[in-house]
Amino acid sequence: LGDVYKRQGYRMGKKLGYVSLGCAKNLVDTEVMLGLLKDNGYTITENLSEADLIVVNTCTFIEKAKAESINTILEVAQYKEDGVCKGLIVAGCLSQQYQDELFKEIPEIDALIGTGAWDQIMVAVDAIEHGNRSCIMENITNIYDERMPRIQTTPRYSAYVKIAEGCNNG
């Protein structure tokens, strides 16, 4: 996955918060991003007020989902504005469809990751750590499989298996 994935020493002890919105495919993408971040030194926290970095994985299938995504981003952006967290990454459908508007309207956003670029989460983190904003909308370069790190967020007795990429609700 490249050199940027191996530079974890200076990330040890940093906390990561996350919000996953939308379908089961989005949840699997979130779990894999969490796995990549954990493998690179981040500790996962459910308390956003403790997080150094927050990832919001969004959905825009229906207008209500789009509104929920925007409201969630605005709530999370407040942590950055208050100086609680140092980085805000928005991933998923909303960032894919509205990248220009999001960067313009919500300056607290540090990185946007499209629906096909979840595997590039560490590239976005590296940019943030160097004081840069990034917008990664590439097609997926690594297809998810069981060897990729994944932090399961569902109860231990159930997990989603992702068999396709992208949104099949639209």
Residue ranges of model-derived segments:
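Short, small-residue-biased leader/transition segments that mark boundaries at the very start
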Residues: 1-5
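Proteins enriched for Cys/Gly/acidic motifs involved in redox and nucleic-acid/cofactor modification
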Residues: 7-170
